[in-house]
């Protein structure tokens, strides 16, 4: 479990993962060494799993993002999972309950590239595609408290 100070530190790092120990110390009322120790323990317990850079896919020519619902053909579940893992344009994928087995997000440079990727996948699964127009809520954590 985490306490209120841990949650405060995590929240601050979620807003800006480059925030200095000095700034985190001022925010929390702890010393910099105490903050460093708390963060080390949170990392050790894998509460904090990493630090990342948010990049705009369009900067690399990926003009379209899509959500793909994927339903493997009979006997193809493992192959479909392997295919998704090996196609680098898939940026996220969740195995889910319900009619579909996977819901995935992918970034492509064009509709033609999307068609090619889906044509290859359709040998193993049925797919349903929705082009993302806007993301009003970016990936985030639920409230910690």
What residues fall within each predicted segment?
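A compositional/biophysical signature of low hydrophobicity enriched in polar/charged and small residues
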Residues: 1-145
């Amino acid at each position: 479990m985490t306490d209120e100070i841990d949650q405060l530190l995590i929240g601050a790092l979620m807003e800006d993962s480059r925030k200095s120990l000095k700034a985190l110390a001022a925010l929390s009322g702890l010393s910099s060494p105490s903050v460093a120790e708390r963060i080390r323990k949170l990392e050790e317990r894998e509460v904090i799993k990493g630090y990342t850079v948010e990049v705009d896919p369009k900067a690399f020519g990926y003009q379209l993002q899509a959500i793909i619902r994927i339903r493997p053909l009979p006997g193809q579940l493992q192959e479909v999972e392997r295919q998704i893992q090996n196609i680098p344009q898939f940026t996220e994928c969740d195995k889910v309950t319900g009619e579909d087995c996977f819901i995935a997000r992918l970034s492509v440079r064009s509709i033609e590239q999307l068609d090619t990727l889906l044509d290859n996948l359709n040998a193993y699964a049925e797919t349903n595609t929705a082009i993302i127009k806007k993301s009003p809520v970016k990936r985030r954590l639920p409230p910690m408290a």
